[in-house]
Amino acid sequence: MFRLDGKMALVTGASGGIGAAIARALHAQGATVALSGTRREALEALAAELGERAHACPADLKDPAAPDALVAEVDKIAPLDILVNNAGFTRDMLALRMKDEDWQAVLDVDLTAPFRLARASLRGMLKRRAGRIISISSIVGATGNPGQANYAAAKAGMVGMSKALAQEVASRGVTVNVVAPGFIATPMTDALNEAQKAKLQEGIPLGRMGQPGDIAAAVVYLASNEAAWVTGATLHVNGGMAMI
């Protein structure tokens, strides 16, 4: 089950922890993976680690032309079957102090770029009557978080966008879904002391922070044939932190 042999996948934000884990998991299931992000050296290192069926495809999604160019580059490797919109960043500030450019910068990368990538990917997917679009949102898109009005808006918008797209393309065999991570362990959280980690984990019923592999497993499922009857869904992977 969950094999992806012969499939072509594009993972954005592949140089980060979650993105790299997703790329590794898709590759392990047999997919060819295009690794995109802004850090060329990290992408090339991951491609070298994975070896055959892995390609570094750097792109800066702040550039409005980048999504179309990236999908065209991937299509030259093989027709794109699986798009994983994982790239994103935060620029936190309380709303009263948030500058317009900080609001817009987050929406440009975290919401507008995923839309542009989906639009570019759908051209081929609809012709082939098959495809998977999977976007990585956040628990913050459902619950909100102080100081993250821009990020919360982008991640909530990603869910609404995905539901609309899912309805538009379902008749052509293309599914559109979302994975919403909760609190995931990162190098930043690794630097916390045990007391600080314990406090963070108090709000997680399963008693631990998530790992990038937890998110990657959800993506593999949604990318697989076994998820062919799942579309317009948001899979919350948060240890029970928010039971939505």
Region locations from a protein language model:
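Short, small/polar-rich loop/turn modules that mediate ligand/substrate recognition or access, typified
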Residues: A170, T175, V230-G232, N238
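Residue(s) in the substrate-gating loop at a strand-loop-helix junction
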Residues: S138
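Alpha-helical segment proximal to the catalytic Tyr-Lys
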Residues: R123, Q167-S171, A228
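Conserved glycine-rich cofactor-binding loop
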Residues: M8, S15-G16
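Substrate-binding pocket helix/loop in short-chain dehydrogenase/reductase
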Residues: L94-A95, D102-L107, T189, L200
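Active-site helix of classical SDR
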Residues: A118, A154, S162
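The beta1-alpha1 cofactor-binding region of Rossmann-like NAD(H)/NADP(H)-dependent oxidoreductases
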Residues: A59-A69, D100, G213-D214
